[in-house]
């Protein structure tokens, strides 16, 4: 196995500065060396706990600091989550991601989260969660339940980060990724394009990700979805070619990682998405909503796949374990009280 490159910001920026077609050729070449270029991994993301998040991320409508009109919702019952997972699997998703608007999960939440993971795993789907900061014990408990991936984005470069978020440090995010990795869970971590960052900041984000002790298995690249009421609602639109460049550089710097088109696809036309796949994207979120912002409908995605000759990737455990599902159905936990599901303060 070839030695990994320890990337510098200068090296990453040099990739961004390449002529676009030359960059795309290099990215597609790298992509074909590590993946089947016709296969796209398909995930579905469900918000299992919406709003009332104590963080101040300037892009996010889930913070009560901003008047966005978003109504907060308590943690979903386990069976509700599993029903959504069944629908996602029927529609072609192979990974089910569950997101909660918390700074961190509390001890009282853990039994419910563990049952969600166990139930989705029993269907033969891969599991992913994004719950905020984790401690080592929480990561281990989720791993024991069978969690495959944990998402915790770095969002942007260390230098620009403080302009976007003040309630959680960059180091806290890196520490959570370390705890996830130590627990044996695969890492999903990426960032957002369009926060007001420079190209050097985009390079800095990708350097942070690529230089982790082990690069993330999954790297979601989001385009800012501007939500009225958030501080970034009036940001300039992202040039599609700048976004495509970011995908291409991510592919070159993290050749074995899945690079996912995440939030913002609703704003992209088919041509832009096609160029992202050419640049090395090989994973998407599939369905009508990403947490609280729009996403293309499933049938539009399938139509685009047919036009481009792409195929949804299948998993080895797609049939699931019916016996395990029946056992879990008898054990599902329900809320003890209405207050049980309040967001972590």
Curated annotation (Swiss-Prot):
Cross-referenced InterPro entries: Aldolase_TIM, BATS_dom, Biotin_synth/BioAB, Biotin_synthase, Elp3/MiaA/NifB-like_rSAM, rSAM
Record GO biological process: biotin biosynthetic process
EC nos: 2.8.1.6
Pathway(s) where this gene product acts: Cofactor biosynthesis; biotin biosynthesis; biotin from 7,8-diaminononanoate: step 2/2
Top class in the EC scheme: transferase
Binding site for [2Fe-2S] cluster: 97, 128, 188, 260
Keyword flag DNA repair: no
Radical SAM core domain segment(s): 38-256
Keywords from the UniProt entry: 2Fe-2S, 4Fe-4S, Biotin biosynthesis, Iron, Iron-sulfur, Metal-binding, S-adenosyl-L-methionine, Transferase
Cofactor note: Binds 1 [4Fe-4S] cluster. The cluster is coordinated with 3 cysteines and an exchangeable S-adenosyl-L-methionine.
Any one GO molecular-function label of the UniProt entry: 4 iron, 4 sulfur cluster binding
Residues holding [4Fe-4S] cluster: 53, 57, 60
Pfam families: BATS, Radical_SAM
Top-level taxon of origin: Bacteria
NCBIfam families: bioB (TIGR00433)
Protein's job: Catalyzes the conversion of dethiobiotin (DTB) to biotin by the insertion of a sulfur atom into dethiobiotin via a radical-based mechanism.
Similarity annotation: Belongs to the radical SAM superfamily. Biotin synthase family.
Subunit: Homodimer.
UniProt protein name: Biotin synthase
Native source species: Serratia marcescens
